[in-house]
């Protein structure tokens, strides 16, 4: 069991109850531990970069939490490569606990930012990626092959629909079906297995609305993809500039 949480987003109307300042980090961890009913977190993520707070201040606060035994490891989420590099180098300079993980969005349909910007900063430093949205908001499951179901995420969230739902992407996802069928797995399992096989990826974060979806996702960890299968997927999903 790995218990993690995040800090950054506003938790109240209080101007200090947000961001990555030392004050907010120190106050937030105690509230988080109380809510979760635990003495410590395995991983504490800085959920977004905070332009209002120096990276040095944030890094030192995280170092202090580890020294106090409230956190075992700390990491970042959706930070730019230069920010990850700066945090790592600051910690090295002062002998503080280093950031150990970054949490970026990454999937077959969202590749360029991670592969061209983030991995060059994280992989040489041993910073592992804990990927979110590996199914591209459900797009890679095949759910949207024939339109948008009313109760689906794309039916509720226009921004997600605009990001991923294009005729080209629908056709790409359809091309995954024969590959998945040949392997005896679902397209969701194929998409998750692909992410897990990528260099620098330590784990993935998945969402599920039903227990059977969760069980289906977990089975992806047992899937082994050959170099030939990876080549087929790369032919379908050539990296494009992320925006």
Could you describe each region identified by the protein language model?
Residues 5-7, 40, 48, 133, ...:
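Short, small-residue-rich loop/turn micro-motifs
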Residues 19-36, 84-89:
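Short, acidic/polar
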Residues 51-235, 240:
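Beta/alpha (TIM)-barrel catalytic core signal, keyed to glycine-rich beta->alpha loops juxtaposed to Asp/Glu
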Residues 1-12, 102-106:
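A short, structured active-site edge motif that brings together acidic residues
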